[in-house]
Amino acid sequence: MRQRTIVCPLIQNDGAYLLCKMADDRGVFPGQWALSGGGVEPGERIEEALRREIREELGEQLLLTEITPWTFSDDIRTKTYADGRKEEIYMIYLIFDCVSANRDVKINEEFQDYAWVKPEDLVHYDLNVATRKTLRLKGLL
């Protein structure tokens, strides 16, 4: 089984948290709301990977003013590829508390939507298991 280390920013701006809705046809959590983030590439440092993933998925214009390592978790997930293939992967999630100076987001093709969500509204979103676990651990659910 393949192993992946995933960096996940929990991005907050003015009391709201950034959630991204995954594309319906790909990824580990198709069609569900999640934190952004992605895999650490060979030879890449953890914070470099986090900043790269944010640029790739959320755009250059989202400015982070704070990045603080927070917690980690792991599990086994089935990834669905655009061509329909499936793969089981052992996932290690490194989760960071982040604060952004703005809400200027430009999502890439991995996502179909995004939202800045106040903690009291998180229950109204179809969150994937990993995001639900993270937000519960943070005391937001």
Curated annotation (Swiss-Prot):
SUPFAM superfamilies: Nudix (SSF55811). Residues 1-141 form the Nudix hydrolase domain. The keyword Repeat does not apply. One of its GO terms (molecular function) is dUTP diphosphatase activity. InterPro entries: Nucleoside_triphosphatase_NudI, Nudix_hydrolase, NUDIX_hydrolase-like_dom_sf, NUDIX_hydrolase_CS, NUDIX_hydrolase_dom. It comes from the Bacteria. The keyword Transcription regulation does not apply. Keywords: Hydrolase, Magnesium. Its EC number is 3.6.1.9, 3.6.1.12, 3.6.1.-, 3.6.1.23. A motif (Nudix box) lies at residues 38-59. Its cofactor is Mg(2+). It catalyses: a ribonucleoside 5'-triphosphate + H2O = a ribonucleoside 5'-phosphate + diphosphate + H(+); a 2'-deoxyribonucleoside 5'-triphosphate + H2O = a 2'-deoxyribonucleoside 5'-phosphate + diphosphate + H(+); dUTP + H2O = dUMP + diphosphate + H(+); dTTP + H2O = dTMP + diphosphate + H(+). Monomer. Catalyzes the hydrolysis of nucleoside triphosphates, with a preference for pyrimidine deoxynucleoside triphosphates (dUTP, dTTP and dCTP). Belongs to the Nudix hydrolase family. NudI subfamily. This is Nucleoside triphosphatase NudI. It comes from Escherichia coli O6:H1 (strain CFT073 / ATCC 700928 / UPEC). The lineage of its organism: Bacteria, Pseudomonadati, Pseudomonadota, Gammaproteobacteria, Enterobacterales. The gene is nudI.
